[in-house]
């Protein structure tokens, strides 16, 4: 089977006057695919609810008419500052409890419901607008999912979500979970670490010495489930 080659392209970085020439040169080099859009949330939605698709429409059309297949990325790895201003508690925390702030990418906690809702909104709008576009031949969900150790967060939001996850993993009567089943599974008789209810459970960091390995394992499994 013949292999095809592609390239990442960021039309939002360049003046529109050079897009056609860029597309032509890509095709002349033998490229078949072009990925765009994965970091362009702010360009697509400058402020909440105000969308600018015109530049993206034009870029996709130019690339497609040049004979290139477009891979459209969802821009969910780079929420704009206005998202953070709306949800200041959406930032993740590292194992030392330090906030991982705005200024690069992946500045959010996967557990945060507000961030999730904003992602659903922009992804849905992109899908409706470009889902049947003949030049959009593939989609990329997010970008480098979980890199920079961002699957793990020690924020209060993550703690609350972890407690909910544990209640489902160790079910009891109703929605309260079985805390004794958790204590037994984690071996919490050691070092007097037994809990009386799930709301007592914190994240496995900032302890005097090594946290309970079973606690760490469940926290890692919870974190993995969030991005599964």
What are the language-model segments listed below?
Residues 1-18:
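Boundary/entry segment of secreted carbohydrate-active catalytic domains
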Residues 10-12, 39, 75-79, 141-146:
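Active-site beta-loop-alpha junctions enriched in small/polar residues
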Residues 12, 16, 49, 53, ...:
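Flexible, glycine- and charge-enriched loops at secondary-structure boundaries
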Residues 20-101, 116, 123-131:
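Aromatic-lined substrate-binding rim segments of carbohydrate-active enzymes
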Residues 100-125, 129-228:
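Polysaccharide-binding and catalytic clefts of secreted carbohydrate-active enzymes
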């Amino acid at each position: 089977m013949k292999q095809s080659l592609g390239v990442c392209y960021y039309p939002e970085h360049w003046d529109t006057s050079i897009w056609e020439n860029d597309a032509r040169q890509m095709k002349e080099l033998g490229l078949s695919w072009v990925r765009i859009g994965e970091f362009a949330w702010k360009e697509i939605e400058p402020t909440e609810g105000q969308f600018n698709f015109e530049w993206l429409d034009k870029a996709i059309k130019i690339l497609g008419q040049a004979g290139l297949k477009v891979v459209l990325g969802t821009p969910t790895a780079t929420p704009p500052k206005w998202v953070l201003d709306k949800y200041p508690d959406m930032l993740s925390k590292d194992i030392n409890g330090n906030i991982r702030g705005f200024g690069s990418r992946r500045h959010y906690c996967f557990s945060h419901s507000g961030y999730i809702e904003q992602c659903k909104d922009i992804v849905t709008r992109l899908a409706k607008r470009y889902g049947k576009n003949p030049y959009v031949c593939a989609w990329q969900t997010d970008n480098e999912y979980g890199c920079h150790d961002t699957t793990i967060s020690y924020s209060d939001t993550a703690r609350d979500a972890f407690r909910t996850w544990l209640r489902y993993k160790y079910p009891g009567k109703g929605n309260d979970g079985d805390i004794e089943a958790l204590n037994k599974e984690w071996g919490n008789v050691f070092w007097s670490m037994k809990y009386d209810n799930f709301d007592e459970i914190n994240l496995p960091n900032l302890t005097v010495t090594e946290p309970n390995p079973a606690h760490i394992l469940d926290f890692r499994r919870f974190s993995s489930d969030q991005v599964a």
